[in-house]
């Protein structure tokens, strides 16, 4: 459930604020987030496991705005990061580094050093060379690095190939066949402390079976490691739980948690870590855009809008479908439109074959844009990145200013005469 709904006046509201008012105040394109929705989705995970020892580590990559991170930090959230930049964002937003897990296949020595100095919860290590590097950096600092190995369980997540991460052909993690051997190596290195086991098989999963298959494989590995004297303290099941974009029927966090807890009856000493990103942020945000022109040809009707693929790349990159609805629905006969932006690429579209009643100047909302929206945006075609607003009841906060054109080349210089 989210808090973007049509009210009695016929307008689309974010909590207690008409979205049209925000468009008029802050301009378009504009990302709008709902604090109540973010909190509701986070609590859905937190409450689903009851009093079982657990930590919710929000995946910063989904939406890294400081206002979003601070909202979750106030709830007690941990964070899943993949760069030192994301780590510094968490700190700037008031996050607790002791609740941070550091994922990613290419951690640099400088990133490792900074994370160790801040005493993060755990490094999710993805290769043997990374183990050796982390052991070296930790030794130079005179500390032990807490580590978990990201295991690739070779489970087909049955999602888009670009967001599938748990197959042996993917770059992520350590293959299941070699997992025990790499754990032995980690256990033998003097500056590492083996804490956990981790996996993340993909994103936007709409069935429980892949999660459960992966978990069963990890629990079997935990048992075999214990027999060798390697004791695993936490199970990090990653993220990936899907959301409703169109007509998907993803499991609820409560269903997911129940299935996991049923399997953890024999492992009550394991802390459970979740890394949800999309499931918390996606439906907590919309992208508001304006219709600039209606272009009719013999073969197609185009609604040319002021938002483009540089603002929201998911439709172009993943062929993703996101609902696009008017802020003020009109009466009349709908026509079928492709909704396209101003960028000079044929792939610059946010929706195709949408039945809408439109006029130039109308305002539209691209739903489910709170995750992998702004964080994947760019300045392609020298377009300033858009503003972001957080709605909290009847109050609104500009949590990111729209970029000024001059800022786009402020770090550049021309050659001397």
From Swiss-Prot:
> What does UniProt list as catalytic?
344
Please name the pathway: Amino-acid biosynthesis; L-lysine biosynthesis via DAP pathway; L-lysine from DL-2,6-diaminopimelate: step 1/1
Q: Name one GO molecular function term.
A: diaminopimelate decarboxylase activity
Q: Which UniProt keywords apply?
A: Amino-acid biosynthesis, Decarboxylase, Lyase, Lysine biosynthesis, Pyridoxal phosphate
- According to the record, the signal peptide region is none
Q: Which PROSITE patterns match?
A: ODR_DC_2_1, ODR_DC_2_2
Q: Which residues carry this modification: N6-(pyridoxal phosphate)lysine?
A: 61
Question: Which amino acids does the record list as binding substrate?
Answer: 278, 314, 318, 345, 372
Q: Which residues are noted in the entry as pyridoxal 5'-phosphate-binding?
A: 240, 275-278, 372
Q: Which reaction does this enzyme catalyse, per its entry?
A: meso-2,6-diaminopimelate + H(+) = L-lysine + CO2
**Cofactors:** pyridoxal 5'-phosphate
**GO biological-process terms attached to the record:** lysine biosynthetic process via diaminopimelate
Matching InterPro entries, A to Z?
Ala_racemase/Decarboxylase_C (IPR009006), DAP_deCOOHase_LysA (IPR002986), De-COase2_C (IPR022643), De-COase2_CS (IPR022657), De-COase2_N (IPR022644), De-COase2_pyr-phos_BS (IPR022653), Orn/DAP/Arg_de-COase (IPR000183), PLP-binding_barrel (IPR029066)
Q: Which CDD domains match?
A: PLPDE_III_DapDC
Keyword Lyase found: yes
The Enzyme Commission number assigned here is: 4.1.1.20
Pfam families of this UniProt entry? Orn_Arg_deC_N, Orn_DAP_Arg_deC
Q: Which protein family is it in?
A: Belongs to the Orn/Lys/Arg decarboxylase class-II family. LysA subfamily.
Functional note: Specifically catalyzes the decarboxylation of meso-diaminopimelate (meso-DAP) to L-lysine.
Q: How does it assemble?
A: Homodimer.
NCBIfam families documented for this protein: lysA
What HAMAP family does the record tag this protein with?
A: LysA
Query: What name has this protein been given in UniProt?
Result: Diaminopimelate decarboxylase
What's the gene? lysA
């Amino acid at each position: 459930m989210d808090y973007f709904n049509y009210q009695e006046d016929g307008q689309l509201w974010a909590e207690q604020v008409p979205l049209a008012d925000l468009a008029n105040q802050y301009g378009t394109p504009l990302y709008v987030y709902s604090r109540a929705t973010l909190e509701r989705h986070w609590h859905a995970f937190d409450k689903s496991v009851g009093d079982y020892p657990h930590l919710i580590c929000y995946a910063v990559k989904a939406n890294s705005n400081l206002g979003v991170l601070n909202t979750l930090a106030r709830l007690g959230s941990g964070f899943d990061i993949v760069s030192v930049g994301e780590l510094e964002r968490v700190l700037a937003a008031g996050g607790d580094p002791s609740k941070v897990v550091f994922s990613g296949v290419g951690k640099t020595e400088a990133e490792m050093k900074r994370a160790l100095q801040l005493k993060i919860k755990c490094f999710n290590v993805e290769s043997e060379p990374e183990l050796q590097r982390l052991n070296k950096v930790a030794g130079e600092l005179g500390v032990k690095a807490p580590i978990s190995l990201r295991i690739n369980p070779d489970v087909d997540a049955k999602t888009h190939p670009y967001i599938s991460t748990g197959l042996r052909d993917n770059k992520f993690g350590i293959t299941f066949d070699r997992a025990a051997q790499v754990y032995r190596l980690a256990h033998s290195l003097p500056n590492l402390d083996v804490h956990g086991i981790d996996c993340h098989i993909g994103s936007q999963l709409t069935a429980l079976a892949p999660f459960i298959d992966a978990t069963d494989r990890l629990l079997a590995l935990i048992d075999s490691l214990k027999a060798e004297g390697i004791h695993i303290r936490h199970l990090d099941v990653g993220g990936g739980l899907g959301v409703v974009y169109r007509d998907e029927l993803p499991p609820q966090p409560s269903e997911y948690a129940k299935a996991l807890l049923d399997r953890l009856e024999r492992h009550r000493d394991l802390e459970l870590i979740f890394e949800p990103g999309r499931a918390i942020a996606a439906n907590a945000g919309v992208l508001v855009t304006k219709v600039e022109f209606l272009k009719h040809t013999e073969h197609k009707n185009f609604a040319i809008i002021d938002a483009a693929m540089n603002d929201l790349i998911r439709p172009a990159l993943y062929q993703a479908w996101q609902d696009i609805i008017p802020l003020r629905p009109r009466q009349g006969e709908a026509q079928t439109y492709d909704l396209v932006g101003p960028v000079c690429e044929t792939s610059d579209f946010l929706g195709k074959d949408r039945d809408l009643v439109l006029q130039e100047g109308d305002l539209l909302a691209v739903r489910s844009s709170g995750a992998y929206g702004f964080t994947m945006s760019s300045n392609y075609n020298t377009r300033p990145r858009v503003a972001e607003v957080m709605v909290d009841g009847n109050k609104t906060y500009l949590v990111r200013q729209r970029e000024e054109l001059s800022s786009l080349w402020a770090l550049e210089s021309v050659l001397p005469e």
